[in-house]
A protein has these predicted regions:
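Short, small/polar residue-rich loop motifs at catalytic or cofactor-binding pockets
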Residues: 52-56, 156-160, 361
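Beta-lactam-recognizing serine transpeptidase/beta-lactamase-like catalytic domain environment
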Residues: 172-222, 227-454, 464
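Hydrophobic membrane-insertion alpha-helices, especially the h-region
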Residues: 14-29
Length: 480
């Protein structure tokens, strides 16, 4: 009996051991087949990181100019990542650092840049058979150098951001943020110098590493009235509908009074006129009448609460929920807890300008493998339909009226149809407000958002579009 018992125990042990080996085998096989890309692209993977720094990483191109490229090095690693016009293009390229990983396109398109993407399997195979060292693919971006120059120059001496989109495709034409930083400081193989630069950048009170264009969110102020206007047009209002516009509006169930920057022109005005002069009381009352759910749904259709499924690293913009009527009134004019990135507000303008269809924004037009063959090209993708064509056409005309007759006059361009909306957003009583301008033009087909942080400019000039509108105009002009 002891012998049979021992045999039974040994049999159970052997089966258990076999099952353990089988489970291990399945796990390893699963990781190799299905998680290889995730593991390879995790910047904490030191083995892969060391290998990456010893290979020729692909270029990031703006036109024919490599704004990020890899050069041979005699240092610790075989190749050094370098950036041309680093500060200007940092919000697009991001950085590629041994200690601090990757950001922006360097991160989102890492498989393409390292040559490990599925699209480059044939290039890898032919390279291996030919005895060539691994080499990454190059990205041809959608960025227009002239538009980027105009955006960058427009932000000189200011804190803020500019985003320009081709609203018919979603292509990012410009993405600038100031103050910025030089990615070369973090890409250097002098690892001690890289650490020192990192600390210095983090300690800088101007926060130059913040990508204000897509990775930071701010109160959108009166530019959010475009979302409220869109919701109204989608729910039975017309540009000529009369809306209540008192000089002051006591927020529901409070003693707090909301006022206007200027006289709205009467107790009742058309929806178009309310947008032209950015009437706070009209849009606050309008939002309360529409309901929280209606505004939240409209904001969601423009992209609030989600991120595009693309190569852009984007913070999630937000429209608050569970609001009382006073909070809803403030949210309807882009205050309270509403927050959006400049990219998000450019998407709002783009959805309106493209007859109600919002295209997914993207930065990479195509990928070229090491053998110079194009192995991947972007396919334009509708992201949502925030408005009907009819409502979008109506809001376009209202925005054109803002530029021709209202607060957006500084964006006017002779011979070009330009629609826009100015905005101010109060952050605290002791600081000047943020300045915004959101707009679009018909030729070229571009939607633009300009954001400028607190400045010493008079509030009346901010509300009048003196800061943002001229920058938007210059970006549009650069694309003509």
């Amino acid at each position: 009996h002891l012998s049979l018992r021992r045999q039974r125990q040994m049999c159970i042990r052997d089966r258990f051991t076999a099952l353990m080996f089988l489970a291990l085998s399945v796990n390893v096989t699963y990781a190799a087949l299905f998680r290889q890309s995730d593991l390879n692209n995790d910047s904490r993977n030191t083995r892969v990181r060391d290998a990456e720094f010893s290979q020729n990483r692909g270029d990031i191109l703006v036109g024919s100019t490599a704004v990020a490229r890899t050069v041979a090095s005699d240092g610790q690693f075989h190749y050094q990542r370098t950036y041309a016009h680093g500060k200007k293009y940092a919000p697009i390229t991001g950085y590629y650092s041994y200690y601090y990983g990757r950001t922006m396109l360097e991160q989102t398109q890492n498989p393409q840049l390292t040559g490990t993407s599925d699209a480059q399997w044939l290039s890898r195979l032919t390279g291996t058979l030919g005895g060539h060292k691994p080499q990454g693919g190059s990205l041809l971006t959608t960025v227009n150098a002239s538009a980027q120059d105009a955006a960058w120059e427009g932000l000189r001496g200011k804190k803020g951001a500019v985003v320009a989109l081709d609203y018919s495709t979603g292509a990012v034409l410009a993405m600038a943020s100031n103050p910025s930083f030089d990615p070369n400081l973090l890409a250097t193989h002098d690892l001690k110098a890289s650490q020192q630069s990192w600390k210095r950048l983090l300690d800088d009170p101007d926060n130059p590493m913040a990508n204000r264009a897509s990775r930071e969110i701010y109160p959108p102020g009166s530019t959010f009235k475009l979302v409220t206007a869109a919701a109204a047009l989608q729910h039975g209002y017309t540009p000529d509908s009369q809306v209540s516009s008192p000089k002051a509006y006591t927020l529901p169930n409070t003693t707090n009074s909301l006022t206007n920057e200027i006289n709205c022109g009467g107790d009742n005005v058309t929806l178009t006129h309310a947008l032209e002069i950015s009437c706070n009381t009209a849009f606050a009352k309008l939002g309360v009448g529409l309901s929280e759910r209606t505004l939240a749904d409209q904001a969601s259709k423009f992209g609030f609460g989600s991120e595009p499924d693309s190569d852009i690293s984007m913070a999630t913009s937000k429209f608050p929920t569970q609001l009382n009527d006073a909070q809803l009134a403030l949210s309807s004019i882009g205050q309270y807890d509403v927050a959006a990135s400049p990219l998000q507000m450019a998407m709002v303008a783009a959805g309106i300008a493209n007859d109600g269809v919002l295209m997914e924004p993207y930065l990479t037009r195509s990928v070229r493998a090491a053998n110079l063959q194009t192995v991947w090209s972007h396919k334009d993708t509708p992201m949502s339909t925030p408005m009907t064509r009819k409502s979008a056409k109506q809001l376009q005309e209202m925005m054109v009226s803002v530029v021709n007759n209202g607060t957006g006059r500084n964006a006017r361009i002779s011979g070009v149809t330009v629609g826009g909306k100015t905005g101010t957003a109060q952050t605290s009583p002791d600081k000047p407000p943020y300045a915004w301008f959101v707009g679009w033009s018909d030729k070229p087909k571009v939607a633009v958002a300009v954001f400028v942080e607190s400045s010493n400019t008079e509030r009346s000039e901010i509300a009048g579009g003196r800061l943002g509108a001229p920058i938007a105009r210059d970006v549009i002009e650069a694309l003509r």
